[in-house]
Regions:
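Non-heme Fe(II)-dependent double-stranded beta-helix
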Residues: 1-26, 33-136, 142-145, 263, ...
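Short, conserved beta-strand element in jelly-roll/cupin
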Residues: 144-163, 219-220, 227, 251-254
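Non-heme Fe(II)/2-oxoglutarate
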Residues: 2-9, 54, 61, 65-66, ...
Length: 301
């Protein structure tokens, strides 16, 4: 089956320029133009509320071991729900807008973009809530079973997202750092790590590279989104506003990304939640191009 992806003349004007791509390559992040209409961001809010109320178009056939999946029994903490592009068609309809994939393809300098994961996030306006603080990390640590270094994430707030709402914060240029050693505890999710340990890791890696830690909270206007490289350190602070911060982290893979065996020091291999869900390739490996879970968002061939 051949998929056709096309942009309107208006959408083509919204693609990153050569200067934007150069900025992304140097800094490891890029704040987009307005890619979603106000109607689309309104629909993201409405669809997310239906999702939180229990609406699903389909459910995962099994719960992978590291699945993030908030439900009301967990209380008024920061909510993370994975695979919303699979489970909820209302959210998927907007997340699968070809323009998002085309922007990502320009930044990653690739011809094809597939969804890797989508996580619905709700950060409540609760002063002092510890789960609202996201410590420093970069995504590729959790994607060690992927062989690509072109992967990237679109952080998509459903509203204007200023620093007081706990917007995403980039460590500028950190995607170009070399890592210290091979401490493979980094493959554990930040929710399972000590925050001070992650702060120390950031400082040590910066020092190793002779770099300064430059933390940039990104003010994101409604309808815009912030793209970051899979090796860019990032985190987010408290929501000290009077309203919830609603967003989706849309994780994206280039068309060449494949599963790889990544041995860990404890004798196991790195795994990702897809490994329990996706079909297998002819040689028995998890297929990160399975269209059920990793649909193509953009292809320009």
């Amino acid at each position: 089956m051949t998929l056709e992806f096309k942009l309107s003349e208006e959408e083509i004007e919204l693609l990153p320029t050569d200067e934007d791509v150069a900025f992304y390559n140097e800094h490891g992040w890029y704040l987009s133009k307005k890619l979603l209409t106000d109607d689309e961001t309104d629909e993201l809010v409405n669809a997310s509320e239906r999702y939180y109320a229990g609406e699903r178009d389909r459910t995962l056939p099994t719960a992978p071991p590291k699945l993030a999946y908030w439900d009301p029994t967990k209380g008024n903490v920061q909510r993370h729900n994975d695979y919303v592009h699979y489970e909820h068609d209302g959210l998927a309809k907007i997340l699968r807008k070809p323009l998002i994939g085309a922007v990502a393809a320009r930044l990653a300098q690739t011809h094809e973009i597939r969804i890797f994961q989508s996580t619905l996030i709700y950060k409540p306006p609760v002063e002092g809530e510890p789960s609202n603080i996201v410590p420093w990390h970069f995504d590729k640590h959790y994607w060690s079973s992927s062989n690509s270094d072109k992967m990237l994430t679109a952080f998509i707030p459903f509203h204007d997202c200023p620093p007081e709402m706990g917007t995403i914060t980039m460590v500028d240029g950190s995607h170009r750092w070399k890592e210290i050693g091979s401490d493979d505890t980094v493959v554990r999710h930040f929710a399972d790590r000590d925050r001070s340990q992650l702060d120390q890791m950031l400082a040590e890696n910066a020092s190793y590279n002779g770099a300064e830690v430059v933390k940039l909270p990104i003010t994101i206007p409604r309808g815009h989104m912030n793209f970051h490289h899979c090796r860019t350190y990032h985190g987010s602070g408290a929501n000290v506003s009077d309203r919830p911060r609603r967003a989706i982290s849309l994780h994206l893979q280039d068309g060449d990304n494949r599963y790889r065996e990544f041995p860990l020091s404890d004798g196991t291999t790195a795994a990702y939640n897809h490994d329990a869900l996706v079909r297998r390739t002819s040689d028995g490996r998890p297929d990160y191009a399975d269209p059920e879970y990793c649909p193509t968002l953009w292809a320009d061939r």
